[in-house]
Amino acid sequence: MNTLNQQYEEKVRPCIDLIDSLRSLGVEKDLALPAIAVIGDQSSGKSSVLEALSGVALPRGSGIVTRCPLELKMKRKKEGEEWYGKISYRGCEKELEDPSDVENKIREAQDEMAGVGVGISDDLISLEIASPDVPDLTLIDLPGIARVAVKGQPEDIGKQIKGLIQRFITRQETISLVVVPCNVDIATTEALKMAQEVDPDGERTLGILTKPDLVDKGTEETVVEIVHNEVIHLKKGYMIVRCRGQKEITEKVSLTEALESEKAFFRDHVHFHTLYNEGQATVPKLAEKLTLELVHHIERSLPRLEEQIEDKLEQTQAELERYGSGPPSDATEKLFFLIDKVTAFTQDAISLTTGEDLKCGDKLNVFSALRREFARWNAHLDLSGEKFNKRIEKEVENYEEKYRGRELPGFINYKTFEVMVKEQIKQLEEPAVKRLKEIGDTVRKAFIQLAHSSFIGFPNLIKTAKAKIEAIKQEKESTAESMLRTQFKMELIVYTQDRTYSNSLSDRKREEDEEEDTRKGPVFAKQRSIVYRMDNHATLQELMLHIKSYYKIASQRLADQIPLVIRYQMLQESAAQLQREMLQMLQDKENMDFLLKEDCDIGSKRAGLQSRLKRLMKARAYLVEF
């Protein structure tokens, strides 16, 4: 094989080793790594290309041969050094003694992971080959695309395979190596269509043409045009190779002999010799190009990879903090652990009611919801006042006729005033109680959410806290409702300080005079100042003025008092009682084991997070050292 210059070789292996190390750590479970994925339709010659690159025989045959993603790690050794192979899957590793063992070992691994037969699996098989005859390169071979299910295959096998391929090639970190036979119409190949769907500009797609010896006479120039990027444009371009056919395999033509035969084929071909001269033909040239592409791709991806690892680390550490370290086994330490948990929760409950930051890290803010509810209450009072003002203008005359006694015209009937004010205030009582219940539900949900965040993994603690929250909500809501109804009973006593009422009355009179002056003009204003009308209409106008003035005072009082009652009972008192009851619960030490019984799967979640944290920290160390 053609060798790369010494300076480049010094850069190639470390780059590829870095990504291989990250993949072997399992980092790909957390984020996508730079890779070259090999895809092609069934019988596209995909396996032959990989055999030619790796120097080992891979599973062959009709139907689906590659049934699991195969990570093919090739490491170039110095001349004279021995061949080395290793296969790894599902945590087990097997060293291979001879290249001839590879095919059977892959079949065994596939049977173990995907079942005996023709099913497929998403699990990765890793095959490492070290030899003087391979390039420094890592590829991921994916199952060939099946169009129709054959005997023994699931009906949706084609859909399953496409789904598996899409999961790899959709990632921006993946270069798609699309294998297409020369003797088919390239535009109809499913593999190229799939690559174009996720990479429409061909930024990360490289085409490989196979089987050039099988093209029909007269179509050779079309093949040359495809390789020259003149038919379907790909920014990474095309290569063309000729690998061993079934006849040569049957005749036991070695891979080395096949490479010599390939070289002669392109060099001497009437049409394809130009591709050979331009460095776009033969497996060795393909190996060089793929190595170059992978290294450049890795170098471009490293800054983003570092950022992703840092983000994942931060996210994982935050999740681990939420899960905690789990309860200790010692009884005394276990009690302290429970006390810490409960104390942190109750302190957060108090903080929630005062609008301060929470220790659990949640961004719960009940005040924004309360502010909206109280603003709606204020708007309801204003709207009720506007409707009341419009209504009394129509109804005050009826009331005057009904309740007026022996007074002469011009005297205001206090009974009419009192009846109308009380009736309006009564209409505000039920909306206030409704607002209380809505806010009670909001606060209850916030406390329950806080319990879930504070007691992650401890279902009995959550259940106990929820029961207390529900009971306290009912109790405090009942107390608050009683206070509200008492407030409305008091509001039926028509009262305010004389000065307050006089000021409100003067303000209202001035507003109405200004409105009337604007409506009727300055002449009317002058007439009004010197003429004192003492007819029935004037009396009614005066009565309306008094009613509107008093309602304004009462509504302002309710706008503040109702929210104060709700906040005091549903937030302040609820949080204080929750704190008392949760701390009182700690007195029952016999209940401690029940409360600290962990969720059955929490241990595995914590172990999974710890494992992720460990591999991400190792990954970060690899990147720092690189």
Curated annotation (Swiss-Prot):
Residues 40-47 are annotated as: G1 motif. Residues 210-213 are annotated as: G4 motif. Residues 30-303 form the Dynamin-type G domain. It holds the Pfam family GED. Residues 65-67 are annotated as: G2 motif. Its main location: cytoplasm. It comes from the Eukaryota. This is Interferon-induced GTP-binding protein Mx. The gene is mx. GO terms for cellular component: cytoplasm; microtubule; nucleus; plasma membrane; presynapse. Residues 141-144 are annotated as: G3 motif. It comes from Epinephelus coioides.
